[in-house]
């Protein structure tokens, strides 16, 4: 039977800083216990009779599946509202939607664009609200990544070094920066200066680092940024629906920051692991991949297929851990 941290009962999870470092570590411990119980088929059902709304203004594979399976494993039911199946923000205000869903559900997950929407849902729902991803933050991904790091390193989190390569202005860059700062880790943001996190986010991370002992580096130099890293992470550079001119500019800026075997060798760590929140453009198996190939002659973008398919890659452990860590959040806040 898992040890459920009662201090998180009824709490929202809108960004990483909603929890203290101790609470974050407690969720990782709970996730590891729940994962072991699932493997052994000895799970205790903490969420019987609970109902959870999944509001998706941005579609997803991993986030939706992780919430649905995590809830089902624990005896809870989910209702999926896709971009066409909800009136939120279109025919009904976010505030009114929150009050309706809060009367019917025990918890609400939201995945969409602005952080302000999930914050407004939380302000008015009267039940725990979870951020499945916004443009600014991706907190459930950080729990999964931290659990994956603990599984693939013998070091405590405070001794683990990781480098994030790519466009660091949005959710993944922000989340990697503040999560590492919160947990006292060695965090490197490796990107063109134009694509660094906003200065206000950097200042928050630096303030956290004073208390946690974290080491924070922002650099344009790939070799400097990855030297000695235990983990190298990246994210997609382009999204469907963006103007092709934006793709062209970003690909031009980020070409030197693609994760290749040379980048992994530059860590000087034979055991370095590769992280990616997925989906990844590592081959020509996607429409975007083929379009980029036709336009730029590239067979991959942010990571080469050689790295993605190598023994260094732990991306599918990371994807699985979305479910275990989301389950921990649901149990801790709703049990």
Curated annotation (Swiss-Prot):
The entry's keywords: Amino-acid biosynthesis, Arginine biosynthesis, Cytoplasm, Transferase
What PROSITE patterns does the record point to?
CARBAMOYLTRANSFERASE (PS00097)
Q: What is this protein called?
A: Ornithine carbamoyltransferase
Give GO MF terms, alphabetically: amino acid binding; ornithine carbamoyltransferase activity
- Indicate the principal place this protein occupies in or around the cell: cytoplasm
Gene that this sequence comes from:
argF
Which pathway does UniProt place it in?
Amino-acid biosynthesis; L-arginine biosynthesis; L-arginine from L-ornithine and carbamoyl phosphate: step 1/3
Classification via InterPro entries: Asp/Orn_carbamoyltranf_P-bd, Asp/Orn_carbamoylTrfase, Asp/Orn_carbamoylTrfase_sf, Asp_carbamoyltransf_Asp/Orn-bd, Orn/put_carbamltrans, OTCase_ArgI
Q: Which GO terms describe its biological process?
A: arginine biosynthetic process via ornithine; citrulline biosynthetic process; L-arginine biosynthetic process
Gene3D superfamilies reported in the protein's UniProt record: Aspartate/ornithine carbamoyltransferase
EC number(s) from the headed UniProt entry: 2.1.3.3
- Keyword Transferase included in the entry's annotation: yes
- Can you list the GO cellular component terms from the UniProt entry? cytoplasm
Catalytic reaction(s) noted: carbamoyl phosphate + L-ornithine = L-citrulline + phosphate + H(+)
Which family does the similarity line name?
A: Belongs to the aspartate/ornithine carbamoyltransferase superfamily. OTCase family.
| Annotated residues for binding of carbamoyl phosphate | 60-63, 87, 111, 138-141, 277-278, 322
Location comes to:
Cytoplasm
């Amino acid at each position: 039977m898992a040890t459920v941290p009662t201090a998180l009962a009824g709490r929202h999870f809108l960004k990483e800083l909603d929890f203290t470092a101790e609470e974050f570590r407690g969720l990782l411990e709970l996730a590891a216990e729940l994962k072991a119980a699932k493997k052994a088929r000895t799970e205790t059902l903490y969420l019987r009779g609970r109902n959870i709304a999944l509001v998706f203004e941005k579609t997803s594979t991993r986030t939706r599946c992780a919430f649905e399976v995590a809830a089902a494993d624990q005896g809870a039911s989910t209702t999926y509202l896709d971009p066409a199946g909800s009136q939120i923000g279109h025919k009904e205000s976010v505030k009114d939607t929150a009050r309706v869903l809060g009367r019917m559900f025990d918890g609400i997950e939201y995945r969409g664009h602005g952080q302000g929407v999930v914050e407004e849902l939380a302000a008015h729902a009267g039940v725990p609200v979870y951020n499945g991803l916004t443009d600014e933050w991706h907190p459930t991904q950080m729990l999964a990544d931290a659990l994956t790091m603990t599984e693939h390193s013998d070091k405590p989190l405070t001794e683990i070094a990781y480098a994030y390569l790519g466009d660091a202005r949005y959710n993944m860059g922000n989340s990697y920066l503040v999560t590492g700062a919160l947990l006292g880790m060695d965090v490197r943001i490796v990107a063109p200066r134009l694509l660094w996190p906003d200065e206000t986010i950097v200042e928050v991370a630096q303030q956290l680092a004073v208390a946690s002992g974290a080491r924070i580096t922002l650099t344009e130099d790939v070799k400097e940024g990855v030297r000695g890293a235990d983990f190298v992470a990246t994210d997609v550079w382009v999204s469907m629906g963006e103007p092709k001119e934006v793709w062209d500019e970003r690909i031009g800026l980020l070409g030197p920051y693609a994760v290749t075997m040379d980048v992994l060798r530059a860590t000087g760590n034979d055991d370095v692991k590769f992280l990616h929140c997925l989906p990844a453009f590592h081959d020509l198996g996607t429409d975007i991949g083929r379009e980029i190939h036709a336009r730029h002659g590239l067979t991959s973008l942010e990571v080469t297929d050689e790295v993605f398919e190598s023994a260094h890659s732990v991306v599918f452990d990371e994807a699985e851990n979305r479910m275990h860590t989301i389950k921990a959040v649901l149990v801790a806040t709703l049990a």
